[in-house]
Amino acid sequence: MAYPGEDYDNDAAYDPYAYSNDYDMHTGDPKQDLAYERQYEQQTYQVIPEVIKNFIQYFHKTVSDLIDQKVYELQASRVSSDVIDQKVYEIQDIYENSWTKLTERFFKNTPWPEAEAIAPQVGNDAVFLILYKELYYRHIYAKVSGGPTLEQRFESYYNYCNLFNYILNADGPAPLELPNQWLWDIIDEFIYQFQSFSQYRCKTAKKSEEEIDFLRSNPKIWNVHSVLNVLHSLVDKSNINRQLEVYTSGGDPESVAGEYGRHSLYKMLGYFSLVGLLRLHSLLGDYYQAIKVLENIELNKKSMYSRVPECQVTTYYYVGFAYLMMRRYQDAIRVFANILLYIQRTKSMFQRTTYKYEMINKQNEQMHALLAIALTMYPMRIDESIHLQLREKYGDKMLRMQKGDAQVYEELFSYACPKFLSPVVPNYDNVHPNYHKEPFLQQLKVFADEVQQQAQLSTIRSFLKLYTTMPVAKLAGFLDLTEQEFRIQLLVFKHKMKNLVWTSGISALDGEFQSASEVDFYIDKDMIHIADTKVARRYGDFFIRQIHKFEELNRTLKKMGQRP
């Protein structure tokens, strides 16, 4: 879709950031120079290329038209219409295509014009300026060299407060609809910026006294309670948990949605906030609570709510990681294998948009690493294509992990784990240089302790596979262990190979204890009796299922051919 005044060729030589002669006058004082540069940037923003002006005006008109139409629909007591859907589609095209192209051309590593500079172009429309600032600050975090300043971090927080206040504190449903992709990106970026600020405030070594005083006097900015409050408020306002409960039981979610939850804006923000809470609790190391917030989401079924691929991938990444840390390896393997198969089959779809591809590709690589860890600690059969990829990427490292190389475990965990954070404001008078690493080091220690407990299990498993009966003392001798130490390790093997595994139900926390180990044993006096529990793959069932599917497809095609 082209917008009015889009003419790249005519403006190709235009440089909105051409330096004027007086910019060479630097004082040598870093603070004065920084202030001068900021003042210069603000002056520069007043000169906006025509193509950008036209784009902003078109963007504003599209959003304004949608809001006007939404007001009309609300007054007529209607939830939505084809007109609304069409305008949302136009905004999606602007958001995903036009904005990205213009960013690449004009603002690849520099900020977009400030909101104050474009305000006259949009009639000082408060709602549009909030949405514009959301994109403006997100671009600074992602692309601008040096990242956001302390002031920009604060300003972005206040802008999110304004956005969520507009949505949550209105007398009735806010007259706004946005594409699902943008709504997901809002929640995703909100949590990312909180995470970024939590780490930023812990790194005080290179901060001036003025910056530290500023942080000390504003402890409520990007406070964990305010972030949790926003996410829970969006969940409650949308009544999304009740909607999901009814939806998964086969009912109509609209019947329990309420005044706000009937509208796409609230429904999707509520759903994305549940995934946001999953992510936030995982970053804080509370894995049980992380999975509990999804108790009404059935992960193993396709859902009308899972329309944004990044949301799907993020959900499975954090659920899989939480399972791994809760020692539910079989569930972690199932979750990772399912989403990796999904990415493998839909990869071409993501390559159309670079930023989506980069994000999904990174989490894809991280999940392969986590799957390698889980399969080493709990060997079981997975999809052949995923297994092949895993062998190509991590074959050597998996062999080293099987031999008990703790360094490889730590290396893969460090690469693939989330960026943990502390919800507590640091003591700015005495901050340890590595204070920002403490949440990660704490989680790494928990993981490393678990690895250490299982260090001998891979070797024991390989010996058990070789025999059906063997004196305990003899097998202990093979492993250079005393008989008592070996009996302890056998007990550890029994304990660690029994996992709580999800079998049915909606809640991902449900399950029953199972063992997927390929060997089992019992001890009778001084003899160990071993049984191979590996089940031969039944290819016949697979082919029968495929034949039935093919016959069903054939019948469907015949019916389609008979239609007039």
UniProtKB/Swiss-Prot annotation:
Q: Which SUPFAM superfamilies match?
A: TPR-like (SSF48452)
Q: Which GO MF terms are attached to this record?
A: translation initiation factor activity
Q: Where is the PCI domain?
A: 331-537
Keyword annotations for this protein, in alphabetical order, are: Cytoplasm, Initiation factor, Protein biosynthesis
Keyword Cytoplasm carried by entry: yes
SS bond list? none
Q: Name one GO cellular component term.
A: eukaryotic 43S preinitiation complex
A Pfam family annotated for this UniProt entry = Paf67
Task: Give me any GO biological process, just one.
Answer: translational initiation
As for subcellular location, the record says: Cytoplasm
UniProt subunit comment: Component of the eukaryotic translation initiation factor 3 (eIF-3) complex, which is composed of 13 subunits: EIF3A, EIF3B, EIF3C, EIF3D, EIF3E, EIF3F, EIF3G, EIF3H, EIF3I, EIF3J, EIF3K, EIF3L and EIF3M.
**Protein family membership:** Belongs to the eIF-3 subunit L family.
General function of this protein: Component of the eukaryotic translation initiation factor 3 (eIF-3) complex, which is involved in protein synthesis of a specialized repertoire of mRNAs and, together with other initiation factors, stimulates binding of mRNA and methionyl-tRNAi to the 40S ribosome. The eIF-3 complex specifically targets and initiates translation of a subset of mRNAs involved in cell proliferation.
Record-linked HAMAP family: eIF3l
Q: Can you name this protein?
A: Eukaryotic translation initiation factor 3 subunit L
Organism of origin: Gallus gallus (Chicken)
